[in-house]
């Protein structure tokens, strides 16, 4: 089959819309995942027995199941279990990214906190700060700097994971590509264009994250 460039140009506006949806889902999902991950990570590191084990169960369940199963459970199974619950595809996608990324960010948080030398914690306590003030004003700022590279990697993973939400009909980049192919039957050209879009997004994001890392001078 000969590659037909003319099949790509009419598809670009729809692919751009799909790329916007992909980014929007990943940004909202990762923002929520950061909150979940920080809470679960601190529960694992500083929490009591109950908080530690609740966070551990959450992390192991989410990391031990495929993201496709998670989104199918949220979108199809939960409304069947709760008759009054209605979840649209976009909400299901965002919530899935939140929960999925949150489990991984929890371990990123835990690793970053544990990597901070205990001398910083001792110094905070010696200055009269309480345990939680030391965590908030001393440990957390240092840990966040060390978390930046793996968080950036998690964002890129989440962007690519959105392609799996084609199973619930979210109009993200992969879904838009599929819809275009259903109309023009040019799979080679359209999937090539979709791949280029993903590559552009991840390369730009990687470049921005590298610049941020250099500016923050990771400790």
UniProtKB/Swiss-Prot annotation:
Induction: By lack of glutamine.
GO cellular component: a single term: ATP-binding cassette (ABC) transporter complex, substrate-binding subunit-containing
Assigned keywords, A-Z: Amino-acid transport, Cell inner membrane, Cell membrane, Membrane, Transmembrane, Transmembrane helix, Transport
SUPFAM superfamilies documented for this protein: MetI-like
Segments on the Periplasmic face: 1-22, 75-88, 172-187
Domain of life: Bacteria
CDD domains assigned: TM_PBP2 (cd06261)
Sequence intervals crossing the membrane: 23-43, 54-74, 89-109, 151-171, 188-208
Protein name as catalogued: Glutamine transport system permease protein GlnP
GO biological process per UniProt: amino acid transport; glutamine transport; L-glutamine import across plasma membrane
Single GO MF annotation: L-glutamine transmembrane transporter activity
Disulfide bonds: none
